[in-house]
């Protein structure tokens, strides 16, 4: 039986591990005993290790046939680098800020296949665009995606269905999109627009850095990705960000050195924590426009998925982690 190691056993990682265990020998690795305990009732082997330690990463992947990366974005690139150095193929969902193509030469030399950003969007969205790009001349690609709770609680009306640290990263990382063949960079949370969805009503969409590898792999003159939230969310987050609450530089408070980001994260995570009983959904709309067989063509895809109450798997974990 093939052996798979899943690095990270958070809200999405442990669901992938449990699903894969039906057909493979799976080991889940995480530094958190609480995260690993979520797999107690599954056949998944559990291993506690600090994946911020390069030597530990190489050690835990030794002897496996495939690695699945599901660590927080802040650790994603370094973890990917060590897996590539160990000569292991990897499918990764980490939302890291670094350019994955910096490891392209190393992966080629090691004979490693690394599929990165393999989630909903980026991930499924890339595959849909690739499918159409092979069959038509694509002129425009638009992707709108988000994961939200059904229960709206003031003021943020949001719960984090994956690493909360990666959520804040979405709100602070500059957003890149393509307009008339040129890459445009704008602040995250910019260009807010309202969109209507039959399944849930009106949501707001704003710029986020979700095109990722598409910026390098696809020659489409117009491409954009936006994140979906309940109306008003972007304004609340912009107020925090622009006031310095996401700052990474230490400041002194009552004789102690602290980072505003760490304090804000601790406060927000209490409100944003997605509990097992919280009903949530994932929603996505993809639009592909161009010329096919000499005629203008427009394709629209819609995804709407909600928590599986039987298994307890969140919608974001299902849509991200299931093949």
Task: Kindly give the residue locations of the regions a language model identified.
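N-terminal Rossmann-fold NAD(P) dinucleotide-binding loop
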Residues: 13-14
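Conserved acidic E/D residue at the C-terminus of a beta-strand in Rossmann-like folds
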Residues: 28-31
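Helix N-cap at the beta1-alpha1 junction of Rossmann-like dinucleotide-binding domains, i.e.
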Residues: 33-35, 97
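Conserved Rossmann-fold cofactor-binding substructure of NAD(P)-dependent oxidoreductases
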Residues: 51-63
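Beta-loop-alpha module in the N-terminal Rossmann-like domain of NAD(P)-dependent dehydrogenases
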Residues: 66-83, 96-100
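Rossmann-fold NAD(P)-binding glycine/threonine-rich loop
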Residues: 93-116
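C-terminal catalytic/substrate-binding lobe primarily of soluble NAD(P)-dependent oxidoreductases
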Residues: 134-323
């Amino acid at each position: 039986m093939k052996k798979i190691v899943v690095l990270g056993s958070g809200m999405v990682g442990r669901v992938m591990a449990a699903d894969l265990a039906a057909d493979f020998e799976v080991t889940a690795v995480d530094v958190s005993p609480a995260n690993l305990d979520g797999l107690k009732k599954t056949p998944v082997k559990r291993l506690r290790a600090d994946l911020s330690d390069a030597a530990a990463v190489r050690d835990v992947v030794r002897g496996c046939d495939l690695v699945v990366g599901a660590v927080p974005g802040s650790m994603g690139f370094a973890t990917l680098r060590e897996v590539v150095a160990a000569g292991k193929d990897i499918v990764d969902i980490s939302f890291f800020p670094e350019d994955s193509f910096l490891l392209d030469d190393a992966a080629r030399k090691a004979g490693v296949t690394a599929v990165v950003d393999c989630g909903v969007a980026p991930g499924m969205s890339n595959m849909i665009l690739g499918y159409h790009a092979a069959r038509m001349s694509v002129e425009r690609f638009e992707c709108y995606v988000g994961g939200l709770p059904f229960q709206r609680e003031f003021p943020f009306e949001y719960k984090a269905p994956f690493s909360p640290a990666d959520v804040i990263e979405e709100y602070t990382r500059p957003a890149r999109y393509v307009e008339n063949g040129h890459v445009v960079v704008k602040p995250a949370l910019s260009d807010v627009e309202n969109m209507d969805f039959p399944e849930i009503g009106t949501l707001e969409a704003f710029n986020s850095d979700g095109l990722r590898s598409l910026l390098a792999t696809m020659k489409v003159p117009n491409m954009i990705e936006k994140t979906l939230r309940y109306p008003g969310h972007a304004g609340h987050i912009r107020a925090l960000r622009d006031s310095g609450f996401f700052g990474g530089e230490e400041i002194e408070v009552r004789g102690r050195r602290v980072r505003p980001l760490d304090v804000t994260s601790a406060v927000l995570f209490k409100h944003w924590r997605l509990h097992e009983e919280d009903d949530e959904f994932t929603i996505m709309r993809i639009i592909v426009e161009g010329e096919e067989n000499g005629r203008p063509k427009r394709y629209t895809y819609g995804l709407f998925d909600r928590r599986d109450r039987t298994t307890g798997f969140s919608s974001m974990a299902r849509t991200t982690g299931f093949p």
